[in-house]
């Protein structure tokens, strides 16, 4: 098996902005998603898809990612984890994803990216499960960003025309792309 690492770094000034609807979040502690405390960096990160900036070495990895459906699905076969940092201007996310066959076909912004290998970030500034942002980036560095009023399962509406102001992304693939040989 080829050990292909797919890495992306996402930056957005807008993600630090908050919004409030007064809605309640999950009612029970077991309903809460995993959390991660992003550290502050004094020096801006270079957005190149690599984790060789000194600030990244001090940031801890998240726990290994699981399926969005939780225990109803088997453990993922390949490791995915992330790191997050912020400074006075940006919020940074880096992902390390092991995948033997990285594929990317979509090149148009706001395409339905999850049809390719992708990494998705959901940002809910006030933690109420409403008025949140979604960003997806595929192996070709194609971006899909939108704002949702609430989750789809709750009748939420979305705005695909909305773009993350100041967004910068980069992807570094250590291995092959679109080659299963």
Residue ranges and their predicted role:
Residues 1-8:
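Bacterial N-terminal signal peptides that target proteins for export
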Residues 8-17:
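Bacterial N-terminal signal peptides
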Residues 19-181:
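Structural preference for beta-rich elements and adjacent junctions enriched in aromatics
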